[in-house]
Amino acid sequence: MKTIHVIGAGIEGQEGFSRRALEIVEHADILIGRAGQLALFPDFKGETLVIEANLAPVVECLAAAKGAAVVLASGDPLFFGIGRYLLRNLPDAELEFVPNVSSVQYAFAKIREPWDDAVFVSAQGRGMKGTVDQVVAHDKIAILTDAVNTPSAIATELIERGRDGYTAYLCENLG
């Protein structure tokens, strides 16, 4: 049975990968990731595939792959990442995950705040209402945003609901 390694890229570029992760990449026949992640491995000799918004070509490529395949992900692939999509669309026995520090872990470290009591929500590609409902319901929350559901849009929605007095940290471009 083939193994597809899904490796989390860390905050520190190639230096943030474990020795094991780098060895897996070195022996891969195909390397899949976003353009910036692939750029971390300029000397990679195998086939590459750039991940775009549509993930179907990634699954097609992995399903057809005969050699060693690696998917580069951000941080922890199973934390609001590509890992969930791959598990839904490929045999889970073929997938092996090698996580790294997630953007949320890194953000909490930067603001010097324990995060074991936080709630995590992704507003990426989702509606605003559920995200804001979570903010209202919890004392500590980390929100992954996108170009539509921005921190500003979330703050505006909170103010429109008459909710204010929150302490917020905006952490961006974390790696």
What kind of region is each of these model predictions?
Residues 108-137, 146:
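Short, glycine-/small-residue-rich phosphate/pyrophosphate-handling segment
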Residues 8-9, 73, 117-119, 141-142:
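Short, contiguous strand/loop micro-motifs
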Residues 1-106, 124-126, 130:
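Class I S-adenosyl-L-methionine
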Residues 38, 121, 171:
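Residue-level "edge-of-site" marker
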Residues 103-105, 109, 170-175:
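Short, flexible loop segments at boundaries between secondary-structure elements
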Residues 2-6, 20-22, 53, 67-69, ...:
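A contiguous loop/helix-start segment that scaffolds small-molecule binding in enzyme catalytic cores
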Residues 84, 88, 109, 156, ...:
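Short, well-ordered alpha-helices that flank and scaffold nucleotide-derived cofactor binding pockets
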Residues 90-95, 113-117, 160-166:
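A short alpha->loop->secondary-structure connector
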